[in-house]
Swiss-Prot record:
Compartments where found: Cell inner membrane
Pfam families from the UniProt entry: KdpC
Origin species: Flavobacterium johnsoniae (strain ATCC 17061 / DSM 2064 / JCM 8514 / BCRC 14874 / CCUG 350202 / NBRC 14942 / NCIMB 11054 / UW101)
Membrane-protein topology: Single-pass membrane protein
Keyword annotations: ATP-binding, Cell inner membrane, Cell membrane, Ion transport, Membrane, Nucleotide-binding, Potassium, Potassium transport, Transmembrane, Transmembrane helix, Transport
Name of the gene this protein is made from: kdpC
A single Gene Ontology CC term: plasma membrane
Keyword Nucleotide-binding: yes
Transmembrane regions: 10-30
Organism placement in taxonomy: Bacteria, Pseudomonadati, Bacteroidota, Flavobacteriia, Flavobacteriales
GO MF annotation list: ATP binding; P-type potassium transmembrane transporter activity
Full protein name: Potassium-transporting ATPase KdpC subunit
Biological role stated in the UniProt entry: Part of the high-affinity ATP-driven potassium transport (or Kdp) system, which catalyzes the hydrolysis of ATP coupled with the electrogenic transport of potassium into the cytoplasm. This subunit acts as a catalytic chaperone that increases the ATP-binding affinity of the ATP-hydrolyzing subunit KdpB by the formation of a transient KdpB/KdpC/ATP ternary complex.
Subunit architecture: The system is composed of three essential subunits: KdpA, KdpB and KdpC.
Cysteine pairs bridged by disulfides in the record: none
Length: 183
């Protein structure tokens, strides 16, 4: 009986610790973060158009396209495809993406296409592409929007984020918001 009482006390203690105290502590820490843990939003004219850290689908030809998503940009179902480079379905999907890029960008060669433009990230929600991924789209965007190609290229270059660790990236939503403001 003594052991049962000790086990019951331990159970209640861990229940309170992990079901009440720990979540409240994490919630409190999140409230100290920028935007109180609600995510880093991107707004246009006071209206939230998206989140900086979650990719969105852009498939219109007058916008920069982001990295493909294995979950069709559904944040509730964040996941990769779990298909490796030896999977025939995966290889066919990557080839289809390459073919689409080459069709829409006839000035490109297959070797010009960066890998991030044809493969999904582990989360399926990557908001960033490589600078090369953005730069290969400049000619299409300039033509679609009837803008000077140098102006669009300059915009891309101004949106390149240099990290302390890791590769340079371009946030697609931020780039497209800036593109909409470009005249």
């Amino acid at each position: 009986m003594k052991n049962l009482f000790s086990l019951l006390k331990l159970t209640v203690f861990t229940l309170i610790l992990f079901a009440v105290i720990y979540p409240l502590a994490i919630y409190g820490i999140a409230k100290l973060a920028p935007n109180q843990g609600k995510g880093e939003t991107i707004s246009v004219n006071g209206k939230v158009v998206g989140y900086q850290k979650i990719g969105q689908k852009f498939d219109k030809s007058n916008y920069f396209w982001g990295r493909p998503s294995a979950v069709d940009y559904n944040a509730a179902g964040s996941a990769g495809s779990n298909k490796g480079p030896s999977n025939a379905d995966y290889l066919a999907l990557v080839q289809k993406r390459i073919d689409t890029l080459l069709l829409v960008h006839p000035y490109l060669k297959k070797s010009d296409i960066p890998v991030d433009m044809v493969t999904a990230s582990g989360s399926g929600l990557d908001p960033n592409i490589s600078p090369q991924g953005a730069l290969i789209q400049v000619k299409r965007i300039a033509k679609e929007r009837m803008l000077d190609e140098a102006k669009v290229k300059s915009l891309v270059e101004s949106k390149i984020n240099t990290a302390v660790v890791g590769p340079e990236t371009v946030n697609v939503l931020e780039l497209n918001v800036a593109l909409d403001q470009l005249k």
